[in-house]
Amino acid sequence: MDRLLQSLQDRPLLFVGGKGGVGKTTHAASLACRLAALGRKVLVVSTDPAHSLGDVLQEKLSGTARALDDNLSALELDPSRMVDENFAAVEKTIAAYARPEMLPRLREHLEAAKSSPGAEEAAMLEAICRHVVEQRQQGFQHLVFDTAPTGH
């Protein structure tokens, strides 16, 4: 593990991925805790809808970063909330250009689009990018992402 940690110290973004049940969350939490123990400022972010990161860390987490100690913070992103926020922003942009009588129909289309293939993934990708920018500005040296399961 020490060689792995040494090789990761210069990598600000770490994504832990794979199929469900293979230990992604445990591995992401372990990496984050070890890097923090080495004095690195770390944020571990779960994009997994199962929200098990809080269980592994034995902490109650939400969509806002919570400091667990001086060097370690954690949060769990809610995919449904990310989709809602993403589509609300799209609606606001469209509403600025559309005629008022078109808005009810546009809202119907946007609501239907929320369940389209890739909508959740696109919203999560945008949220991840936003967190990368914001958290780097706040001085985090590493962002460790515990990703949603693949292979489904």
Regions from the language model: what does each represent?
Residues 1-15, 22, 27-152:
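Flexible phosphate-sensing "switch/lid" loops adjacent to ATP/NTP-binding sites
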